């Protein structure tokens, strides 16, 4: 007898009938019907939204939708004061970002070095940096030092 598609049947025991919920204790899914006791998930409202955070304002509403922050693009300069140059460098010595890093006066170069005018300076130095404050520029040039802006 040839095998026909309409004669095919599932193997006995391979297909179980679905369990009907809430149809008595004997069914195994009576009383609470697999929903546990009380609580929001046991009620008839279904699932909680994926953005629900228990009543606090959710992150989607908290985050700004407009505007722009330039923080990731800002330039960060390593700062050195004039008083530091006075303390660690001798007369007519050249000061460069690499020398400052070597002497551990700055932790890292970042986007460059900025010289600020805190303190006093009494000896002329040749200072090479990316940016100088107005007071630092005046103090270095007043004692006969030279300033070179590097890019």
UniProtKB/Swiss-Prot annotation:
Keyword Transmembrane: no
Region described as Disordered: spans on this chain: 1-51
Gly residues: bias regions: 23-33
A GO MF term: rRNA binding
SUPFAM superfamilies assigned: Ribosomal proteins L15p and L18e
Entries under InterPro entries matching the protein: Ribosomal_uL15, Ribosomal_uL15/eL18, Ribosomal_uL15/eL18_sf, Ribosomal_uL15_bac-type, Ribosomal_uL15_CS
A GO cellular-component term linked to this record: cytosolic large ribosomal subunit
Any Gene Ontology biological process: translation
A Pfam family of this chain: Ribosomal_L27A
Superkingdom of the source species: Bacteria
Record keywords: Ribonucleoprotein, Ribosomal protein, RNA-binding, rRNA-binding
Family label: Belongs to the universal ribosomal protein uL15 family.
Purpose of the protein: Binds to the 23S rRNA.
Subunit structure: Part of the 50S ribosomal subunit.
Protein name stated in the entry: Large ribosomal subunit protein uL15
Annotated source species: Petrotoga mobilis (strain DSM 10674 / SJ95)
Recorded name of the encoding gene: rplO
């Amino acid at each position: 007898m040839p095998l026909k598609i309409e004669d095919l049947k599932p193997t006995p025991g391979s297909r179980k009938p679905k369990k009907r919920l809430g149809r008595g204790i004997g069914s195994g899914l009576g009383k609470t019907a697999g929903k546990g006791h009380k609580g929001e998930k046991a009620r008839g409202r279904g699932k909680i939204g994926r953005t629900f955070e228990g009543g606090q304002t959710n992150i989607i509403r908290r985050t700004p939708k407009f505007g722009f922050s330039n923080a990731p693009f800002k330039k960060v300069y390593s700062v050195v004061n004039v008083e530091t140059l006075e303390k660690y460098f001798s007369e007519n010595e050249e000061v460069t970002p690499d020398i400052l890093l070597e002497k551990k006066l700055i932790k890292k170069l970042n986007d460059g070095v900025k010289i600020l005018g805190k303190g006093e300076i009494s000896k002329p130095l040749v200072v090479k940096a990316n940016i100088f404050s107005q007071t630092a520029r005046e103090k270095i040039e007043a004692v006969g030092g030279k300033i070179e802006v590097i890019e």
